[in-house]
Amino acid sequence: MKSWTAAAVAAVCVALLTSDARPVKTTSGLVSGAAGRNTAITVFKGIPFAAPPVGPRRWRAPEPAPPWDGVRKADAFSPSCIQTIVTEKKPWTYEFMTHGEVSEDCLYLNVWTPATSSTDRRPVFVYIYGGGNVEGSGSIPAYDGEGLASKGLV
């Protein structure tokens, strides 16, 4: 199961690295991103990389993301996995804590890429946040990939 998940993540990243504002094709369907704070960057937020782990899929090996029809708008972060809500009494830095919606349906990835199309192959940087299934999220501002993408490195 790990190999198909890695392959799906890689396929989505490769497809998006060659994109501009036009929708791009992934293994599950078309997605459209949005301009980043730096308009030379396109950001794709909330792309599913597996089927939602709810109901009978709860605590089971992940299954491929179901395909969708049309163009999926990928311009907003997805919910974080279920975890403790942020409080001021936690001993760690506030900006590393989840602030938004939480849900069991939380298997999504975000991609930052230069906004112009390119046929050049680029390295892909995959960052999986920690948290031990207790905390963390791909929407935490400290994990924003725009800085790396704006340097043209990934």
Question: What residues fall within each predicted segment?
Answer:
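Classical eukaryotic N-terminal signal peptides for Sec-dependent ER targeting/secretion
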Residues: 1-11
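Non-catalytic accessory segments of hydrolases
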Residues: 3, 16-154
